[in-house]
């Protein structure tokens, strides 16, 4: 059965990079059949898998050719590791709702049976925080069964992760979606690992992987590749391999217990991310 996973996190935290590198590791090291469905109007969730190519989005095709023009041949491309790639896209700037575009694109892909049983994993790479109903759709309507949140030891990344968990709790009972863990995409913050581990414990989940910061990630991106394709024998490729393995073997799924604002403030104060002047 296809496992459907949504990756959330604060804007700029590295969701797309983490998703693509994890998917590439699953395909290359474990032979898994993967699809990435980008749910961001920037349509950049699959560019490393596709060698830097910006593909035609579902919403662009829908606007230009109508619903009958949206076929898998038009909007689905295959890249590294035979990973299938789809981008939702969004409305023209200043017009319409990008969240509605996510809803429309996912529904169209379901109608076309894009998430078929031949796939082992489908990843939904979702824009930023749970900011509106459209971007919360993978959680709200059970389009994804598993959620992983990309965070770091930075204050705003933790606040965003906590807010995402609050959104999950609202819909978890009706949709069956569960939190699979937190992926720490390290920013080299002092005490970062310990902070994330305590943060996860407060949420009732675990840090599924600590991804160290390594310049080879940027070098691979400059060459329009994932780390696995660019340098499969590198230490960082092995980090993504281990992250892929842990997700494949994960059986620890929970409804999180988000913190109150006072609890969040206490946590970041404990680790020196917020001084008392800022807190007042």
Curated annotation (Swiss-Prot):
A Pfam family assignment: Fer4_NifH
E.C. number: 1.18.6.1
A molecular function (GO) term: 4 iron, 4 sulfur cluster binding
A biological process term (GO) from this entry: nitrogen fixation
PTM text: The reversible ADP-ribosylation of Arg-100 inactivates the nitrogenase reductase and regulates nitrogenase activity.
Catalytic activity annotation: N2 + 8 reduced [2Fe-2S]-[ferredoxin] + 16 ATP + 16 H2O = H2 + 8 oxidized [2Fe-2S]-[ferredoxin] + 2 NH4(+) + 16 ADP + 16 phosphate + 6 H(+)
Residues holding [4Fe-4S] cluster: 97, 132
Presence of the UniProt keyword Phosphoprotein in the record: no
Amino acids binding ATP: 9-16
Keywords: 4Fe-4S, ADP-ribosylation, ATP-binding, Iron, Iron-sulfur, Metal-binding, Nitrogen fixation, Nucleotide-binding, Oxidoreductase
Cofactor binding note: Binds 1 [4Fe-4S] cluster per dimer.
Cofactor requirement: [4Fe-4S] cluster
SUPFAM superfamilies: P-loop containing nucleoside triphosphate hydrolases (SSF52540)
Modified residue annotations for ADP-ribosylarginine: 100
Role noted for this protein: The key enzymatic reactions in nitrogen fixation are catalyzed by the nitrogenase complex, which has 2 components: the iron protein and the molybdenum-iron protein.
Family: Belongs to the NifH/BchL/ChlL family.
UniProt subunit comment: Homodimer.
Protein name in the entry: Nitrogenase iron protein
């Amino acid at each position: 059965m296809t496992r459907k996973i949504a990756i959330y996190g604060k804007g700029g935290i590295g969701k797309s990079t983490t998703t693509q590198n994890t998917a590439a590791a699953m395909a290359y090291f474990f032979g898994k059949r993967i699809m990435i469905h980008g749910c961001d109007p920037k349509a950049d969730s699959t560019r490393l898998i596709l060698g830097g190519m910006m593909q035609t989005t579902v919403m662009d095709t829908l606007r230009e050719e109508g619903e009958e023009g949206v076929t898998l041949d038009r909007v689905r491309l295959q890249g590294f590791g035979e990973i299938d790639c789809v981008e939702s896209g969004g409305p023209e700037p200043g017009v319409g709702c990008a969240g509605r575009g996510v809803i429309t694109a996912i529904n169209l892909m379901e109608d076309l049976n894009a998430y078929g049983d031949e796939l082992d994993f489908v990843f939904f790479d979702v824009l930023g925080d749970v900011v509106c109903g459209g971007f919360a759709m993978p959680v709200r309507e059970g389009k994804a069964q598993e959620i992983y949140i990309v965070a770091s030891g930075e204050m705003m990344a933790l606040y965003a992760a906590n807010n995402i968990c609050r959104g999950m709790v609202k819909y978890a009972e009706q949709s069956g979606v569960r939190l699979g863990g937190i992926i720490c995409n390290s920013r080299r913050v002092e005490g970062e690992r310990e902070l994330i581990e305590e943060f996860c414990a407060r949420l009732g989940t675990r840090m599924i992987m600590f991804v160290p910061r390594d310049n080879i990630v940027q070098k691979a991106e400059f060459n329009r590749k994932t780390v696995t394709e660019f340098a499969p024998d590198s230490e960082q490729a092995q980090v993504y391999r281990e992250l892929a393995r842990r997700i494949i073997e994960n059986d620890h799924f929970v409804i999180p217990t988000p913190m109150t604002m006072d609890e969040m403030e206490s946590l970041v104060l404990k680790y020196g991310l917020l001084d008392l002047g800022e807190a007042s």
